[in-house]
């Protein structure tokens, strides 16, 4: 519908009176502009971002819907790129309620190897010990339904020893700085692989999500 970026609104592209489908505009982090059809069977987001608050001391943002009472939770996203030393006690005491841990990724080169994040085990164990809710995400480079299932099964294998109550996330991204094995995927391909991954995760009893 309307996408908010850095506090500014990008206007709906709209449609005409001849039955043309409405489209919406959005920007990525590099400010590239895109348009996509507005799906009439998908409910519009009801959040009013004018109710988004920023704590002056911590810089943390909070949101509570004045009508429904729905309240946002504060969380962080970590991977090996945050290094080996995270003070999880301090994370918990700062007000963080949940953490999304990168479980792994499929390399975007030709081999497409499945790789466990170097800090996955340590991050999950320490976050759980600190009393945080934990979810995980996997960076996908699937180019077939079979590879999407393979990725999901890789994730499930590495989840089974932990009490993961947060979402299990399918993370697919456009590789802008290099060539990638997914460059030939169509929009429908990405949709199909996402669905296959999420269905496999849900069948195993976890809550799937899309980054």
Task: Name what the model sees in each region.
Residues 60, 68-196, 202-204:
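Substrate-binding cleft of extracellular glycoside hydrolase catalytic domains
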Residues 6-104:
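Boundary/entry segment of secreted carbohydrate-active catalytic domains
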Residues 201-211:
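Aromatic-lined carbohydrate-recognition surfaces of secreted/lumenal glycan-active proteins
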